[in-house]
Amino acid sequence: MDMAHYIDGFVLPIPRDRLSAYENLVKAVAEIWKEHGALDYLEYIGDDLTLEGTRSFADLVDATEDEAVLFGWVVFDSRETRDLANEKVANDPRMAELVASSNSGFNAKRMVYGGFRSLVQSRSTGAV
């Protein structure tokens, strides 16, 4: 099965004392993204961020000791679908309302972000 998806990937710091509020925000935001064309929306919290000889995600976003590092991606069936979804999400009034009211500590200026086309996709038969 060759499914060459397109993804938006991102890494960002969130204050640890606001993780619950951020999680609630992301649950709502994920549904909006899927409503506008995303196939999947995933975010993970950093648990093991150091490997000798490499630059850590925490360094990448200048995370402090009081911040958790989140890594996520949004999956689309194509770049075209992603571009349309980005436009729709940017114009969806629910997004600004959610972020403004969430008290989640989200700061887009500290987020590292980019769009990526598929290079290799190797999955186990039973993989999620």
Regions found by a protein language model. Name each.
Residues 7-14, 52-89:
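Short, well-ordered beta-strand segments in beta-rich or mixed alpha/beta enzyme
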Residues 20, 80-82, 121:
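Residue-level signal for secondary-structure boundary sites
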Residues 6, 17, 25, 66-69, ...:
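Generic preference for well-ordered secondary structure
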Residues 1-4, 30-38, 72-76:
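A broad, low-specificity signal for short, low-complexity segments enriched in glycine/proline
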Residues 2-28:
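Long, hydrophobic N-terminal alpha-helical segment
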